[in-house]
Amino acid sequence: MDSLRFLRILLLSSSILLLSLRSTVTAGDIVHQDNLAPKKPGCENDFVLVKVQTWIDGVENEEFVGVGARFGKRIVSKEKNANQTHLVFANPRDSCTPLKNKLSGDVVIVERGNCRFTAKANNAEAAGASALLIINNQKELYKMVCEPDETDLDIQIPAVMLPQDAGASLQKMLANSSKVSAQLYSPRRPAVDVAEVFLWLMAIGTILCASYWSAWSAREAAIEHDKLLKDAIDEIPNTNDGGSGVVEINSISAIFFVVLASGFLVILYKLMSYWFVELLVVVFCIGGVEGLQTCLVALLSRWFQRAADTYVKVPFLGPISYLTLAVSPFCIVFAVLWAVYRVHSFAWIGQDVLGIALIITVLQIVHVPNLKVGTVLLSCAFLYDIFWVFVSKKLFHESVMIVVARGDKSGEDGIPMLLKIPRMFDPWGGYSIIGFGDILLPGLLIAFALRYDWLANKTLRTGYFIWAMVAYGLGLLITYVALNLMDGHGQPALLYIVPFTLGTMLTLARKRDDLWILWTKGEPERACPHHVRLEQCSEK
């Protein structure tokens, strides 16, 4: 097996892996719903994340994040409207019986357990507390709900649950100082963040670059093919075989592609852990190195053509150009540095560079041969996205796609198979993210459109590429609108992108009477150079 074929197989394997995660989500939803905890009078709050800012002796100290209860007074959203109130521990600590300490508008801290949450809140309110902080007995947060048989739900103080480590920190503060105060508020996310604009431009730019590279290569191959025909060469190299470095998928492989992605998604969901994410990081680094190397070699070969055309035989890999040997160490070091520092705030830059390079390279290698295959692939992916974001909740009691995207149970901030940008003006921080498949799958169809336009000598207006790009941009824009309307809950991007992109291509093709040739052949009819030469000879 030569190095080129090995590279292609490696990249295809990576692309299958990456396609298993596609939902566009934001890290850390601040508003949560729970169908297992239905609302009723006096117990109808949304589960919102709450910031608990502390002060010691008037000096600002640690900030904790908790979750508001289904019952009680709603928590203010603006920091300026939140009062800075004295903190005390309840006596008894569980607040399951009337409190012995009399409070005057203090925020009381209680421990979870021994009685219902509403009983703790009623006892705290009766003692004069202005708010209730319940410390969980685990590191995770827990949604505080009302029991089905509860009727006394007229609770007029807010209740917030904090994780176990926050409780330990608060206990240490109160042990060292008697002047500890806190401020409770739940700021809202902005309707639109600049990060979403940049992410939109990043997705558009990635498909644009990949499409032009793919179309340029296809046109060069077509010109070379015609030249060989004109020279009357008996054996014309087949540009569709493995020697060209291009892999064309068919309808069967498109369906199998999505089935395999579903299987891998379930494996991710079931085996998600720290060590499994480490394995994904290694796989991502391998694919990222190959992608970055391919892009850099293609770019630099215009200035260093001699180094790009001179090869040396490397054991186990076969012939490799000097330019590839020069670029490879940089790519490897870049990926290793990202892997080492990936938990730092600046690591998203390296992740996006590796991800974009990998997507562009896969779009250069994998081709959709016609509109029929593109329709099958995107239709299957459309159903796949809807199933694993929405329908999977019925089977697994949570959205499998979103759980995998967030990297739950992994101890890390999501898996690396996505592009992300920090939310710049969001008080909660986090990232706006988009799965590789939301770029890669529509990109296959859009790149096909540009290849057809160039081979058919169509202009931007009379071609299909520009309209497919506009449709993709609108579909992705609608995705972000839906994301914000749903309070940041994960949205299957292909639910909006596929109808826009595929619908535009099919409608235009039918209107222009190109549907049959796009659906079956995928390239325009071209005159045979031999026929042209024979006609010229007969005229003499």
Swiss-Prot record:
Record-annotated PA domain positions: 95-173
Statement: the UniProt record of this protein carries the keyword Glycoprotein: yes
Example GO biological process: proteolysis
Signal peptide positions on this chain: 1-27
Lumenal side: 28-196, 270-278, 341-345, 392-429, 484-488
Glycosylation sites: 83, 176
Record-annotated membrane-spanning stretches: 197-217, 249-269, 279-299, 320-340, 346-366, 371-391, 430-450, 463-483, 489-509
Catalytic machinery residues: 385, 438
Keywords: Endosome, Glycoprotein, Hydrolase, Membrane, Protease, Signal, Transmembrane, Transmembrane helix
Source organism, top-level taxon: Eukaryota
Entry GO terms, CC: endosome; endosome membrane
Cytoplasmic side: 218-248, 300-319, 367-370, 451-462, 510-540
One Pfam family here: Peptidase_A22B
UniProt key word Lipoprotein: no
Enzyme Commission number: 3.4.23.-
A GO term for molecular function: aspartic endopeptidase activity, intramembrane cleaving
Post-translational modification: Glycosylated.
Membrane topology designation: Multi-pass membrane protein
Family that this chain belongs to: Belongs to the peptidase A22B family.
Protein function: Intramembrane-cleaving aspartic protease (I-CLiP) that cleaves type II membrane signal peptides in the hydrophobic plane of the membrane.
Domain notes: The PAL motif is required for normal active site conformation.
Protein name per Swiss-Prot or TrEMBL: Signal peptide peptidase-like 2
Species: Arabidopsis thaliana (Mouse-ear cress)
